[in-house]
Each structure stands twice: as C-alpha cells, then as structure tokens.
A protein has these predicted regions:
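Gly/Ser/Thr-rich loops at beta-strand to alpha-helix junctions
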Residues: 76-80, 154-156
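Amphipathic coiled-coil/heptad-repeat helices and related helical stalk/stem segments
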Residues: 57, 82, 130-134, 169-171
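Conserved nucleotide-cofactor-binding alpha/beta core module
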Residues: 91, 98-142
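Structural motif
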Residues: 71-73, 117, 148-150
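Short, flexible loop segments at the rims of nucleotide/cofactor-binding pockets, characterized by
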Residues: 47-52, 76, 123-128, 163-164
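Short, glycine/charged-enriched secondary-structure capping and boundary segments
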Residues: 86-88, 113-115, 162-164
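Membrane-anchoring hydrophobic helices of lipid-metabolizing enzymes
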Residues: 1-73, 83-85, 92-94, 112-113
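Membrane-associated lipid acylation/remodeling enzymes share a hydrophobic transmembrane-juxtamembrane segment
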Residues: 95, 138, 142-172
Length: 172
C-alpha cells in the first residue's frame, strides 16, 4: 500500500471499501439484473448504466487505428472504471482488444474474451502464469489486435489522507 504504517493503510482501505465498493457492488448487481450483454455490447451498456459520461471528442476517437497492432498505455486513477472507459472508447472503432488485468477480474463471462489475466507476484505459479500472459499478449498483437495496459499495475493512490492520487512506479 501507499502508507508505510499498516494501521493507516488498512484504515484507508476500509474507508474506501465502505464508501466506493458498496456503491459499485450495488451498481454491478443492478446491471446484472438488467441483463448484461455478452461481448462488445457490454461496454456501452455498462458505461450508461453506471452513469459515466465520456467527454472524449469524436476527432480523438477517430485517431484510434481501425486495424493493425496497437498498444494503449494508460494511467489508472479510478480502478475498474478506467478499463471500462478505455474498452468502451476502443470498442467504438474496433472490438479486437484485450485488457491486461489482475486475474481476479477475469472471471466475468460477459467480457472474459477481452481479458488477459496478469498474475499477482505472490501466486505460487506467478512466473509460469506471467510467461503465459506474455505469450498470449504477443500472439494477440502479432494477429493485429489491441492491448490495453496499466503499467503501474495498480490503482493510483493518495499519499496522504486528502492529497491527489499519485501513480505508482511502472512495472515494465
């Protein structure tokens, strides 16, 4: 975590969980009840259901190449929402994208085809899983697909109680 003091770190995590996580879980359950679609239609419906407005100008979306290998590198200030927003924006142009994401987020059947699991370093077979991730990523790029990645590997966190979110060092 961001804090060296385990008590502070746990307190922040608890506050975040009690506020944002509960609301997010309610939204997810409501979305599931509404009939979450499989595949590419998932992204725009999820974004609308969550009440997220994407203000990226269409001329910027038009800069996304419609074909050919592409790597999208992004900061990660908002957690799950970052991947969803990028997926929705890329999906407006092409649906051959994959998001490198922690393995615990890959079990969602509706969007599993868009995920490449990134193992946690503490997993018993992390090295083997990491090699599989790399191979799958390279195969997808060689086939002309899009890879979306968050190089810090974690959500940006505040260094204090009220400060701005700061990106972690990149893990490249």
């Amino acid at each position: 975590g961001t804090f060296k003091n385990p008590l502070k770190s746990q307190t922040i995590r608890t506050i975040e969980w009690l506020t944002a996580k509960v609301q997010l879980l309610r939204l997810i359950r409501s979305f599931e009840k509404s009939g979450a679609p499989f595949g590419a239609p998932f992204w725009p419906k999820a974004i609308r259901h969550m009440g997220i407005r994407i203000d990226t100008p269409e001329d910027e979306i038009a800069r996304i190449p419609p074909t050919g290998p592409l790597v999208v590198v992004a900061n990660h200030p908002s957690g799950l929402v970052d991947g969803m927003v990028l997926a929705e924006m890329i999906n407006r142009v092409r649906s051959d994208f994959r998001i490198l994401t922690r393995s615990l987020l890959t079990g969602i059947p509706e969007v599993e085809e868009f995920m490449i699991p990134v193992p946690f370093p503490h997993e018993d077979n992390a090295r083997e899983l990491g090699l599989q991730m790399r191979d799958e990523t390279m195969r997808h790029l060689k086939a002309g697909g899009v890879i979306i990645l968050f190089p810090a590997g974690k959500v940006a966190m505040s260094e204090g109680w009220w400060g701005p979110a700061v990106e972690a060092e990149w893990n490249v």
